[in-house]
């Protein structure tokens, strides 16, 4: 079986449910179930090719590697650690019971060679795998994983631009993949209508089926008629439109249409695999990506130019426009749009104050498969954080509107101090039997202290340290030392090869005293690195938070 052919398998994968173990302990059962859950057809964008989300973000290098990972996890002891190199299981080593059970490194290249061209050569030879962020680190939970972050972004945009009220307003965006698919629901929850352009009908069908988008328009005229009707009625309805953003946005400009917010979440970070050139069919795009990759990349970037130029015109008209972290500005800049960065990224514009307090995407998954376990943890979050009415509102909306994909899961943005409190409480719920099986807690790599990405999470840092990637390396090392159950270190997630480095962690709450000790360390230290990183850069909010939380930052005399 060749490296390429072993990427394809027509099979449905579903993680085990219940309390029956297939591995030797919950510490190894958890990564096994979460890897399988990443590839559940309810979760993954293209499970047959091991693609979870984000263009070609995969969970394992090929099907042979997947099989061997599962086989190895089933036999792994609680004092051993499995090493994963770009989706391939390469070694098992004796460590100790408080060490991670799995250590993962995905897509990492020496900086000079950190380009899509070199990566694609390696990938074609079966020597590399693009892990995106949570695809190759086995903690993807479907579009819910980004819904609250997108919701928080839209809410903050409404606060800054429309006096905190998006009723009667509408968002223009594109991309309904694993990440972009969160946009329509997030806009609805924030009170706005949205027009969501997507070039693949299958993705629109997926979002309609899972309740992330409300309706599909038959063409642009129909979409605009619906937008006008719903905004006049003050209804927050999301509309999908099958088409190409590089064609539709310029047409909207020509017609003089004025959205209230404009952004984009196409997979522009990967022009070879993630952005359809205008006037091409998807089938033609995929065929020519194999036969004429340089031609495809050129055509995709040329279309991105049209897309970005339209976004710039909207901005010049006074409409709030922002990059949602897919590196489309960079792609357009590289082929001649010198002012591509005139519109800002979402992190410095709307999210950074949260990062300064270690607040970010805290997520957990019920390994039992029982939705009641999630509903019980929702109630526990409200009990332990009684004064955070914004968070309570989010949890209520999530329960009402968000469909679980695969194993039941929840996301909520909480910060330093809160994460450890919640994790320890969940562990006690497992110990007491209130929850029917262990919980895993993880996060997106998009977090306060775990990523260096100058065109996204670390854009426009106040001290100019945007590209310093020591921070995610330190985050991964500290989470390993603290006893996370698995730790990952990736390159290129979100924005593509050469533009980011980032780390992830997952910890198991199995109800034991040993788990409680690990949880206390990991869920304090992990967000604390974000406060440290921002305090070191000079953000006063972060410095104050560090002092308030008793962090020992020697150069800042915080203790």
From Swiss-Prot:
One GO biological process term is: L-histidine catabolic process to glutamate and formamide
- Residue numbers binding NAD(+): 54-55, 132, 178-180, 198, 203, 244-245, 265-269, 275-276, 324, 494
**Molecular function via GO:** urocanate hydratase activity
| Enzyme class, spelled out | lyase
Pathway(s) where this gene product acts: Amino-acid degradation; L-histidine degradation into L-glutamate; N-formimidoyl-L-glutamate from L-histidine: step 2/3
Provide this UniProt record's keywords sorted from A to Z: Cytoplasm, Histidine metabolism, Lyase, NAD
Q: Which GO terms describe its cellular component?
A: cytoplasm
The active site lies at: 412
| Signal sequence extent | none
Q: Which Gene3D superfamilies match?
A: Urocanase like domains (3.40.50.10730), Urocanase superfamily (3.40.1770.10)
Give me the reactions it catalyses: 4-imidazolone-5-propanoate = trans-urocanate + H2O
User: What main location does UniProt list?
Assistant: cytoplasm
Instruction: Tell me how the cofactor is bound.
Output: Binds 1 NAD(+) per subunit.
This protein's record includes keyword Cytoplasm: yes
Bilayer-crossing residues are none
Q: Which Pfam families match?
A: Urocanase, Urocanase_C, Urocanase_N
Purpose of the protein: Catalyzes the conversion of urocanate to 4-imidazolone-5-propionate.
Q: Which NCBIfam families match?
A: hutU, PRK05414.1
Q: Which family does it belong to?
A: Belongs to the urocanase family.
* Name of the featured protein: Urocanate hydratase
Q: Record the organism.
A: Photorhabdus laumondii subsp. laumondii (strain DSM 15139 / CIP 105565 / TT01)
């Amino acid at each position: 079986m060749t490296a390429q052919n072993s990427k394809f398998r027509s099979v449905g994968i579903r993680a085990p449910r219940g309390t029956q173990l297939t591995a030797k302990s919950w510490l190894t059962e958890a990564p096994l179930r979460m890897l399988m859950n990443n590839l559940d057809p309810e979760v993954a964008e293209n499970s047959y090719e091991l693609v979870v989300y984000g263009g070609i973000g995969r969970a394992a290098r090929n099907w042979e590697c997947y099989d061997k990972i599962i086989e190895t996890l089933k036999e792994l002891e609680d004092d051993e650690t499995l090493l994963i190199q770009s989706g391939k299981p390469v070694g098992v080593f004796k460590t100790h019971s408080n060490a991670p059970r799995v250590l993962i490194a995905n897509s990492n290249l020496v900086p000079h060679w950190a380009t899509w061209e070199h990566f694609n050569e390696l990938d074609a030879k079966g020597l590399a795998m693009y892990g995106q962020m949570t695809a190759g680190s086995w903690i993807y939970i479907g579009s819910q994983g980004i819904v609250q972050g997108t919701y928080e972004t839209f809410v903050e945009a409404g606060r800054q631009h429309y006096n905190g009220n998006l009723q009667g307003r509408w968002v223009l965006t594109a991309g309904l993949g694993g990440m972009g698919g969160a946009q329509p629901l997030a806009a609805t929850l924030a009170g706005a209508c949205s027009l969501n352009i997507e070039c693949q009908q299958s993705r629109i069908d997926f979002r309609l089926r899972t309740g992330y988008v409300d309706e599909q328009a038959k063409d642009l005229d129909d979409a605009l008629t619906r937008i006008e009707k719903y905004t006049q009625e003050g209804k927050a309805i999301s509309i999908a439109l099958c088409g190409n953003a590089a064609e539709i946005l310029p047409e909207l400009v020509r017609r003089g249409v004025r959205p209230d917010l404009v952004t984009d979440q196409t997979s522009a970070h990967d022009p070879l695999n993630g952005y359809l050139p205008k006037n091409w069919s998807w089938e033609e795009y995929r065929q020519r990506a194999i036969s004429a990759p340089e031609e495809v990349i050129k055509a995709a970037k040329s279309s991105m130019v049209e897309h970005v130029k339209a976004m710039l015109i909207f901005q010049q008209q006074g409409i709030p426009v922002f990059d949602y972290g897919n590196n489309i500005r960079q792609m357009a800049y590289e082929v001649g749009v010198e002012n591509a960065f005139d519109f800002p990224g979402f992190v410095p514009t709307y999210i950074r104050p949260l990062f300064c307090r270690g607040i970010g995407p805290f997520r957990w998954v019920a390994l039992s498969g029982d939705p009641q376990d999630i509903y019980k943890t929702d109630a526990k979050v409200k009990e332990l954080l009684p004064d955070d009415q914004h968070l309570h509102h989010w949890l209520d909306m999530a329960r009402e509107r968000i469909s679980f994909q695969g194993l039941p899961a929840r996301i909520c943005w909480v910060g330093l101090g809160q994460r450890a409190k919640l994790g320890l409480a969940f562990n006690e719920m497992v110990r007491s039997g209130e929850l029917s099986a262990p919980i895993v807690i993880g996060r997106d790599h998009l977090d306060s202290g775990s990523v260096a990405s100058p065109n996204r999470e670390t854009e426009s840092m106040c001290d100019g340290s945007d590209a310093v990637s020591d921070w995610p390396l330190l985050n991964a090392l500290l989470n390993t030392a603290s006893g996370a159950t698995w730790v990952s270190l990736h390159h290129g997630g979100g924005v593509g090869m050469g533009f980011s480095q980032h780390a992830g962690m997952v910890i198991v709450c199995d109800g034991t005293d040993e788990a409680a000790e690990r949880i206390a360390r990991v869920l304090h230290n992990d967000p604390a690195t974000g406060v440290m990183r921002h305090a070191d850069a000079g953000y006063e909010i972060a410095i104050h938070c560090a002092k308030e939380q008793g962090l020992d930052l020697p150069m800042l005399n915080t203790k």
